[in-house]
Amino acid sequence: MSPRMAWRAIQSALPKDAIISSDIGNNCAIGNAYPTFEEGRKYLAPGLFGPCGYGLPSIMGAKIGRRDVPVVGFAGDGAFGISMNEMSAIGREEWPAITMVIFRNYQWGAEKRNTTLWFDDNFVGTELDQQVSYAVSYTHLRAHETTS
């Protein structure tokens, strides 16, 4: 499923008062074009060149502040990896569960794209380990993973 299809499908299933967040990167930049906001709908985003790792902590705060409202975050696997320290906070029993959609392309996509454009397809350090599973790493913190 493409990021565009995922954004559209998830947004169409959410109620109008839902809070949506995204991180930086190619997958979220695509999604920035799709959310619409009606009846108090909120969109939390760092902007295209904002702080990497913003998505997870932003939905944590939004869900703690508005437990009664659905909150969904979107991030690429690179940006999500930056915020892995926040996973220790999510495991607190008194905190509500959150929903984070992680797009897995196993690379720092924006950086790889820029280096292939600017340096004749010469890129280094942009590939992520395909064996890493964020959910397996933090299973004891109530995380689980779904793929499609």
Predicted regions and their residues:
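Thiamine diphosphate
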Residues: 29-142, 148
